[in-house]
Swiss-Prot record:
The lineage of its organism: Bacteria, Bacillati, Bacillota, Bacilli, Bacillales. Reversibly transfers an adenylyl group from ATP to 4'-phosphopantetheine, yielding dephospho-CoA (dPCoA) and pyrophosphate. SUPFAM superfamilies: Nucleotidylyl transferase (SSF52374). This is Phosphopantetheine adenylyltransferase. PPAT is a validated novel target for antibacterial therapy against Gram-positive bacteria. Substrate binds at residues 11, 43, 75, 89. GO terms for molecular function: ATP binding; pantetheine-phosphate adenylyltransferase activity. GO terms for biological process: coenzyme A biosynthetic process. It holds the Pfam family CTP_transf_like. It catalyses: (R)-4'-phosphopantetheine + ATP + H(+) = 3'-dephospho-CoA + diphosphate. It is an enzyme of class 2 (transferase).
């Protein structure tokens, strides 16, 4: 049987339990999961690329088939480099789908061999976004149910 590799891209600024839910649910469907931290030219990050990588690595260390990498450029190029045939994207709501559909269409034009798999977030995470978590953290509210402990500590330090 063919060794299957999937890529889960994102800015992960920072990683949340919503992201982790999608990553964990993907691990038993593919032999290898690459969490690909994309440097997004449109988003100015709260955490540096290196900090985001560290937060993700700490959050997924219990998942042996997950690798964390950074990449700037076209996602389909990264997929080709690592031999991935699938991109996994998490969806929280219909509004996410419209944006994701445009990305998927472009990726298909660039490389017809790569498929995109959409996973609905679990209902208890459907309202969580990195932006909302950061906003709540800035007011020093409890964010423990939204992010792993290591990330919570890093956010508290950022918003001292």
């Amino acid at each position: 049987m063919e060794h299957t590799i999937a890529v889960i891209p994102g800015s992960f600024d920072p990683i949340t339990y919503g992201h982790l839910d999608i990553i964990e649910r993907s691990t038993d469907r593919f032999d290898e999961i690459h969490v690909c931290v994309l440097k997004n030219s449109k988003k100015e990050g709260t955490f540096s690329l290196e900090e985001r990588m560290d937060l993700i690595e700490q959050s997924v260390k219990h998942l042996p088939n997950v690798k964390v990498h950074q990449f700037s450029g076209l996602l389909v190029d990264y997929c080709e480099q690592v031999g991935a045939k699938t991109i996994i994207r998490g969806l929280r709501a219909v509004s996410d789908f419209e944006y994701e559909l445009r990305l998927t269409s472009m990726n298909k034009k660039l490389n017809n061999e790569i498929e995109t798999l959409y996973m609905m977030s679990s209902t208890n995470y459907s309202f969580i976004s990195s932006s909302i978590v950061k906003e709540v953290a800035a007011y020093r509210a409890d964010i423990s149910e939204f992010v792993p402990p290591y990330v919570e500590k890093a956010l508290k330090k950022k918003f001292k």
